[in-house]
């Protein structure tokens, strides 16, 4: 019997872009599970993340992602991460056990989210909206 394709998406909640992205992927024939890329919407935690203090939140971040990982009962065709701030290479490697393709898209510059550079080597495809970042880091340009 035909099985639908599955996508797991981590995207910041931002002016409902996450919901629109989910709809667009569903329109491509995927069952989509959507999660916020950040483990909390608490303003203090979001500020720590934005300022790059992820080490302080390491246990919270790992716990958040592992909880989601442990709920996956079937293989996932695509893990899509949009504008990552929290997810680490170690977490991506864990998800690789259940996700056959890992795709990352940056809608922000690496100047603002330098930790995302560590994800390039862990991804099957890595895209950016920033032409300077695309050239500097030899990644694919995909404007907004």
What are these model-predicted stretches?
Residues 2-3, 74:
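Short helix-terminating capping/connector loops at secondary-structure junctions
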Residues 3-13:
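Nucleotide-activated donor-dependent transferases that construct or modify glycoconjugates
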Residues 10, 19-21, 28, 33-138:
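Extended catalytic core of nucleotide-activated donor transferases of GT-like folds
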Residues 143-144:
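Short beta-strand->alpha-helix junction loop in the catalytic core
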């Amino acid at each position: 019997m035909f099985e639908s394709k599955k996508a797991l998406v981590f995207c910041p909640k931002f002016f409902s872009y996450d919901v629109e992205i989910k709809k667009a992927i569903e329109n491509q024939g995927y069952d989509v599970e959507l999660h916020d890329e950040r483990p909390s919407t608490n303003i203090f935690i979001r500020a720590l993340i934005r300022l790059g203090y992820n080490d302080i939140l390491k246990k919270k971040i790992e716990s958040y992602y592992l909880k989601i990982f442990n709920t996956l009962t079937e293989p996932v065709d695509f893990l899509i991460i949009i504008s990552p701030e929290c997810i680490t290479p170690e977490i991506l490697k864990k998800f690789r056990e259940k996700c056959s393709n890992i795709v990352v898209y940056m809608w922000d510059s690496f100047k603002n989210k330098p930790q995302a550079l560590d994800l390039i080597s862990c991804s099957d495809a890595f895209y950016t909206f920033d032409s300077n970042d695309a050239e500097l880091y030899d990644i694919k340009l995909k404007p907004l």
